Amino acid sequence: MPIIKSSRVNIGRFTIGGSIPIVIISIFDHDAKSLTEKFETKKLSDKNLYEIRFDLFDKVNIDEELEIIRALDEMDIDYIFTYRGHDPEKIYETAITKMVPAVDMDLSLLNKVNRRSPDTRIMVSYHTDSSKDMIEKLDEMLKANADIVKVACNYKDEKNFFKDLIEIAQRKEISGKPVLFIPMGKSFLRVISAYYVSDMVYAKYDKETAMGQPDPDYYNKAFSLFNYIG
C-alpha cells in the first residue's frame, strides 16, 4: 500500500515510496515563537513529517520565515514548506536558499522560482474543482522538473473520483514518480486514494488547512485495517 508503487524519494528522514503512505500533519501558528514553543513543550512531536503552511500564519514576512526555518533546523524537524500568498517567488527562493527539506509550490510557479538545491525536494501541485483540468495538468506535471507530484480536486460526485483514480493510477504506474492524489471534501476518499496511489496523505493538527482533512489517528486506524485485510 499504496498498490501502485513509485520510485523512492527522501524528505529528511522520511522515505516516500515505501510500504505505507506517509502521514503529513499540516500546521500553522501565530508566529515562529508560538510554533517553536509547541515543539519545545512536546505538543508537537519531532517524530512526524509536517507541512508548514506559512501563508496561514498571522505574521508573514521574510524575517519570520527565516526564524521558522532556523528554529526547525535547530530542532531537526522534517517538513514541507508551503506558501500560497503574496509574492510567492521571493518566499520560495528564500526557503530553497536555506535548504528546507521540501517545498510544495503551485505548477504556475515552477518555472518562475529559479532557485534549486540538492537538499530541497520539489513538490509541484495543482488544485482545482475540475477533474478534466486536473488530469490534463497531471500529464504536464509528471514530465516537469520536480521530485513529487500532487493533484487535488474537490468532488461533488464520487463517481468522478473513482474515474480519476483509475486515470491517475495508470499514469503513476508508467512514470514511477511519487504522486499524491488528494480528493478534497470527504475524508474516506483520501483513504481510498492512499490505498491505491497516494504516497503521502495530509492530516490536520487542530484545524483543517484543506477540506476533509482527518486527524492522523484516522489514517493510522485505516492503514492498520488494510494491513490486516492484506
Curated annotation (Swiss-Prot):
Report the domain of life of the source organism.
Archaea
State the Gene Ontology BP annotations: 3,4-dihydroxybenzoate biosynthetic process; amino acid biosynthetic process; aromatic amino acid family biosynthetic process; chorismate biosynthetic process
Instruction: Give this protein's Gene Ontology molecular function annotations.
Output: 3-dehydroquinate dehydratase activity
Q: Which reaction does it catalyse?
A: 3-dehydroquinate = 3-dehydroshikimate + H2O
Residues involved in 3-dehydroquinate binding: S26, E51, I52, R53, R84, R190, T209, Q213
Q: Which CDD domains has this protein been placed in?
A: DHQase_I
Q: Does the keyword Lyase apply?
A: yes
What is the protein's quaternary organization? Homodimer.
Q: Which HAMAP family match?
A: AroD
What is the protein named?
3-dehydroquinate dehydratase
Q: Which gene encodes it?
A: aroD
